[in-house]
């Protein structure tokens, strides 16, 4: 059955860090999805994720507003690119990477879709809380 998810029906959670908010529309918990996750993600100016990957899940990101910086490679920082409003970014399954809001003053807003039923995040850097390999809430 087709399902419409209105903004008020999305599940809002903190993302990978306090400066990231996920407004989850499609996931296993929201609509019973078995193979698709889709959310609007807002990141505060200057914020960035920890070094991570998404396991076997491919990721599509559409930049709605702002400018993003992505780094990737064996340690998550060897290569770099920026993406602006209107750009799509593809992140292959297993790609170790970091996402950052490249602006010091404007929020970054993206639509993120992944071919798995939840956010599926695997951290590699230990982070400030020492919580390696703990998936983010979906």
Which residues does each PLM region occupy?
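Residue-level signal for beta-strand positions within conserved beta-sheet cores that form or flank
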Residues: 34, 79, 106-107
């Amino acid at each position: 059955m087709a399902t419409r998810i209105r903004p008020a029906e999305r599940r809002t959670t903190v993302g990978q860090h306090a400066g990231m908010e996920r407004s989850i529309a499609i996931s296993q918990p929201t609509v019973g999805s078995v193979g698709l996750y889709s959310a609007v993600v807002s990141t505060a100016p200057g914020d960035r994720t920890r070094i991570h990957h998404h396991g076997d899940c491919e990721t599509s990101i559409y930049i709605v507003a702002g400018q993003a910086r992505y780094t990737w490679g064996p340690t998550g920082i060897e290569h770099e690119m920026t993406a602006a409003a209107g750009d799509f970014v593809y992140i292959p399954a297993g790609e170790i990477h970091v996402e950052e809001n490249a602006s010091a003053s404007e929020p970054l807003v993206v639509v993120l879709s992944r071919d798995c039923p939840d956010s599926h995040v695997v951290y590699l850097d230990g982070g400030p809380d020492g919580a390696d390999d703990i998936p983010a809430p979906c």
